[in-house]
UniProtKB/Swiss-Prot annotation:
Family: Belongs to the UPF0434 family.
Record-linked SUPFAM superfamilies: Trm112p-like (SSF158997)
InterPro entries cross-referenced by the UniProt entry: Trm112-like
PANTHER family for this protein: PROTEIN PREY, MITOCHONDRIAL, ZGC:162634
Gene3D superfamilies in the record: 2.20.25.10
Organism: Rhodopseudomonas palustris (strain HaA2)
Name of the molecule in the record: UPF0434 protein RPB_0294
GO cellular-component term (any): cytosol
Amino acid sequence: MTTPPERPETSVDRKLLEILVCPVTKGPLEFDAARQELISRGAKLAYPIRDGIPIMLPEEARKLG
């Protein structure tokens, strides 16, 4: 039996992270490499990164507890 390939962790370019803001609060975002998400602490949302592309749509974001 073979194990499925692990999802390669990607990083977000620092300059891109400086430019991107939360579309809800216009506040800063933090990169969570393990979950491949951009976190908005102000909005309590986690925006997914799919195939290296941040999905900055509030309806696609995961709500944080």
